[in-house]
Structure formats: C-alpha cells, structure tokens
C-alpha cells in the first residue's frame, strides 16, 4: 500500500520547450524538497532543454 507522504514519490518532468514531452522518475523528498529541474534531451525538438517537476 502506497503512502501519501512516501519518501520517494514518482514525479513527472515536463519539457519547458512547450512540446509536452515528459519523463517519469522518482526523487527523494528528504534530499530534494524543492521542485526538481533537470537538463534532459527532448526528442521532439532534438535538443537538450530544462525539464521541470510538475505536480
């Protein structure tokens, strides 16, 4: 049974390029309490762009 306050929740990372492309990953709430921002590859525009955590 999953808890609401899980230590490692599943999050979606959405492209800031506006393509709607997403990555799904997990994060540790204790180490990263703020919203995650990662630079990853967006295959729709064939570039590396920032992906931001959406809730």
Curated annotation (Swiss-Prot):
Keyword tags: Ribonucleoprotein, Ribosomal protein
The name this protein goes by in its record: Large ribosomal subunit protein bL33
Keyword flag Cell inner membrane: no
Pfam families in UniProt: Ribosomal_L33
Species of the source: Arthrobacter sp. (strain FB24)
Gene3D superfamilies named among the record's database cross-references: Ribosomal protein L33
Gene name as annotated: rpmG
A cellular component annotation (GO) from this entry: cytosolic large ribosomal subunit
UniProt family annotation: Belongs to the bacterial ribosomal protein bL33 family.
């Amino acid at each position: 049974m999953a808890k609401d306050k899980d230590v490692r929740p599943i999050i979606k990372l959405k492209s800031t390029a506006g393509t709607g492309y997403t990555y799904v990953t997990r994060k540790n709430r204790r180490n990263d309490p703020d919203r995650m921002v990662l630079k990853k590859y967006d295959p729709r525009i064939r570039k590396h762009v920032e992906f931001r955590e959406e809730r």
